[in-house]
């Protein structure tokens, strides 16, 4: 701890043998020794709650982050979708989601092994992150399924985004992860826009129905939810 000529007291924050950072206190005039000592004691008191806050923040991050891909997981997705849906209702703004599934992923795992399958998931995640605009969010929905949240985006814009992602994955060689090219990697994507009275569960169901329509009718395509899809659904 030291005083510089510009009357700034620099206090290093330590706790539990960890360096947390530095607290700078600026004085209008040269401080007294008593003031310096008080600040030193105050810095010690600040360090422990700061350490606790950082640990809590890290625990929260871990609970909302998918460990394999590094993007947000289902827990974080549920919260983000609720907030986005509330905002869409309150401000009457467009809200769309994409449900993305890797075609024949079981065959990838069976042919190349689960470690290669994990690498594919990580590379696909990188493509999704590159495709995201500032307000977009990507989540791992589970297994080989991903969900993208597109706020202030109507159906046409969501379909355009879906096709950009699909084509990027179709032409991606995945950096030599696959030893052979007889197993092309493609995705099917379900697209759904929130209607006026839709809640989050209804929106997810629409995207899910669109996704499985795409998979039943050829795969490697992006399909927007419609009445035709609703009537084609096995549950209808």
Positions of predicted regions on the chain:
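A short, aliphatic-rich beta-strand micro-motif
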Residues: 6-15
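Amphipathic alpha-helical "output/dimerization" segments
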Residues: 31-51
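Conserved nucleotide-binding and Mg2+-coordinating catalytic segments in signaling enzymes
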Residues: 60-79, 100-114, 122
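Short regulatory alpha-helical coupling segments
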Residues: 61, 74-94, 125-133, 151
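Short catalytic/binding micro-motifs of nucleotide second-messenger systems
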Residues: 87, 130-135, 167-180, 211-213
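Alpha-helical scaffold within the catalytic cores of cyclic-nucleotide enzymes
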Residues: 125-126, 157-175, 208
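A short pre-motif secondary-structure segment
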Residues: 137-140
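Catalytic-core segments of nucleotide cyclases and related cyclic-nucleotide turnover enzymes
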Residues: 159, 193-236
């Amino acid at each position: 701890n030291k005083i510089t000529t510009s009357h700034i007291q620099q206090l290093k924050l330590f706790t539990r043998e960890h360096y947390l950072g530095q607290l700078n206190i600026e004085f209008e005039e040269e401080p007294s020794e008593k003031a310096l000592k008080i600040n030193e004691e105050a810095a010690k008191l600040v360090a422990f709650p700061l350490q606790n806050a950082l640990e809590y923040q890290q625990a929260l991050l871990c609970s909302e982050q998918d460990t394999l891909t590094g993007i947000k997981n289902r827990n974080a997705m549920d919260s983000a979708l609720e907030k986005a849906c509330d905002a869409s209702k309150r401000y009457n703004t467009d809200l769309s989601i994409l449900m993305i599934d890797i075609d024949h992923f079981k065959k990838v795992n069976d042919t190349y092994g689960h470690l290669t399958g994990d690498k594919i998931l990580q590379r696909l995640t990188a493509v999704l992150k590159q495709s995201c605009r500032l307000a977009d969010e990507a989540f791992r929905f589970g297994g080989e399924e991903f969900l993208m949240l597109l706020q202030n985006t109507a159906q046409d814009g969501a379909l355009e985004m879906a096709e950009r992602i699909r084509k990027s994955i179709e032409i991606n060689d995945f950096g030599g992860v696959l030893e052979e090219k007889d197993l092309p990697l493609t995705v099917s994507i379900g697209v759904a826009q929130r209607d006026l009275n839709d809640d989050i569960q209804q929106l997810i169901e629409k995207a899910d129905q669109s996704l499985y329509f795409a998979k039943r009718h050829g795969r490697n395509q992006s399909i927007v939810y419609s009445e035709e899809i609703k009537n084609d659904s096995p549950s209808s």
